[in-house]
Amino acid sequence: MTMATLLLKGILGIPMRHLIGALCVLSAVTSLSAQKPVWKPSPGHTQIPIWPGAAPDPQPVRGPEFMEISGKDFHPGGRPATGVNNVTRPTMTVYSPRGNNTGVAVLVFPGGGYQTLAIDLEGTEVCDWLVPKGITCVVLKYRVTDVGPYPKSGPYPESPMALEDAQRAMGLIRLHAAEWHIDPHKVGVLGFSSGGHLSAAISTHYSKRLYQPVDAADKESCRPDFQVPIYPGHLSLAAAQWDARQGTKKFVVPHAANADRDLSINPEVPVTAQTPPAFLLQNEDDHVDNVNDSLAYYIALKKAGVPVEMHLYAQGGHAFGLRRTKLPVTAWPQLVETWLKTIGMIQD
């Protein structure tokens, strides 16, 4: 299944009106053996493999990793978006400030329904914003294989790949903190859609690695110091129950009989008083991931006494990244900057 097909169907099984369209023809070569292009970071930046050997819990894929460009029906901010598919060898790419350095670092999780990665719209373009602010930005190209049970990845027994990659990357950032001029106590996460869910997942699954420790990086804490889930999915009980019915492996989501399905938290996101501070953003007209995902997470965080700031907007839909339009929601990066000052991560 291509990125375009997936996103047109809707990450949560709901028809999508604002997401990536049909796959463009990326090669004039008609041979069946022709290779599709692969994503590479901008000059001067290198993808760093996060596992020294094979990644744990490997999943089958239909072919090699490849990149695709969105069709004309999905040009957020007037530009196409780039997706990366069939990722089996996860990497992270570090973008460091050249001048002023606050010591803050953000690990970025692009969205894509755990089946593809919106690598520019919800990845590298975050770094275009953060690096000039003196913040180190690390884009995680986590595993998405487009096969197997749904979700294709996440903190579920069926396929914990993305959370394993997130835990590993967080440990690597702290291990190399001095080398990369990062304060190890100021490392947060920011993710979109499924990447927003992954932000919440690592913020509630950090006490123990999901994999056998590999080296010194896995002795470092993988708890984020702050989290920024942007239009996140999979966070309400209703969303978790929908997830449980997908794919070939069905499973039961344990919950109280009288639980509010829309506003109760997904049991796979066990919020505690130690969950890091959160900034949440979502739109009322998000037809991909319901606004109740943010509301359910907000309520759970408040009940646990975790500092949380939430912004809800009437319009804006889903998958807009940082691309500015006339809609007020697209000014959200300024709100995050203010919030980072509020929680003491950066100074005025």
Where are these regions (language model features)?
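Primarily recognizes the serine-hydrolase "nucleophile elbow" in alpha/beta-hydrolase
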Residues: 164, 168-243, 262
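Conserved alpha/beta-hydrolase "acid-adjacent" motif
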Residues: 287-293
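Mobile cap/lid helix-loop segments that gate and shape the active-site cleft of serine hydrolases
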Residues: 68-79, 213-220, 224-270, 276
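Short beta-strand element of the alpha/beta-hydrolase
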Residues: 103-111
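N-terminal cap/lid segment of alpha/beta-hydrolase-fold proteins
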Residues: 36-99
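Short beta-strand/loop motif that positions the catalytic acidic residue
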Residues: 280-282
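Catalytic nucleophile-loop/oxyanion-hole region of alpha/beta-hydrolase
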Residues: 118-119, 123-126, 140-184, 326-330
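Catalytic histidine neighborhood in serine/cysteine hydrolases
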Residues: 302-319
